[in-house]
């Protein structure tokens, strides 16, 4: 089984356990992993309160994972806007990240790093992609609603992470793991 293979690998390479072996691939110390898990556990109360409120508001007897995506109001509709206004909103929301970040974000907008709208044959979803020495590209399927604004901010976060990593690191050191990619996108 996969578990036995992982255990064998960890033992053969003299890791303390399989967790340490898995984390070592991304150069993540187990203490960081443990700290992230501990922080999540210490801060579950607001999530539980939100789920209880959502369950009550939706009139559900049981709450399932898919219910998390069910809207409880139309408030998000008030965020609906065209792409130009979305850029303004995202820029304002990311202003705490400073001048360099704002300048790079504006460069991405001005120099058309983003494939914005749905087209025939275009893949669904959204993602950021790039290679060293070339600015990143972002694929969106923008619609005038809150989720698209949020997705724009999220994907530009990935794009600017790549941009700054490539700008400040050599080729050999510019790549990063998915763990790093998603940890940096969580702003206080």
Language model: regions and residue ranges:
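Cation-handling catalytic/transport regions enriched in His/Asp/Glu
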Residues: 1-185
């Amino acid at each position: 089984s996969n578990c036995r293979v992982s255990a064998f690998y960890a033992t053969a390479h003299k890791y303390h356990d399989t967790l340490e072996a898995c984390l070592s691939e991304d150069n993540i110390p187990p203490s960081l992993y443990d700290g992230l898990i501990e922080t999540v556990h210490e801060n579950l109360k607001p999530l539980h309160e939100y789920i209880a409120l959502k369950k009550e508001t939706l009139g559900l007897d049981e709450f399932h994972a898919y219910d998390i995506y069910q809207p409880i109001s139309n408030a998000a509709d008030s965020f609906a806007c065209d792409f130009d206004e979305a850029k303004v909103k995202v820029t304002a929301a990311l202003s705490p990240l400073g001048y360099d970040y704002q300048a790079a974000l504006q460069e991405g907008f001005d120099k058309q790093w983003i494939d914005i709208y749905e087209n025939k044959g275009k893949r669904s979803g959204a993602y950021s992609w790039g290679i060293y020495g070339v600015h990143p590209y972002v694929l969106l399927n923008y619609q005038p609603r809150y989720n698209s604004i949020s997705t724009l901010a999220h994907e530009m976060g990935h794009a600017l992470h790549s941009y700054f990593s490539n700008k400040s690191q050599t080729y050999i050191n510019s790549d990063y793991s998915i763990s790093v990619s998603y940890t940096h996108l969580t702003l206080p």
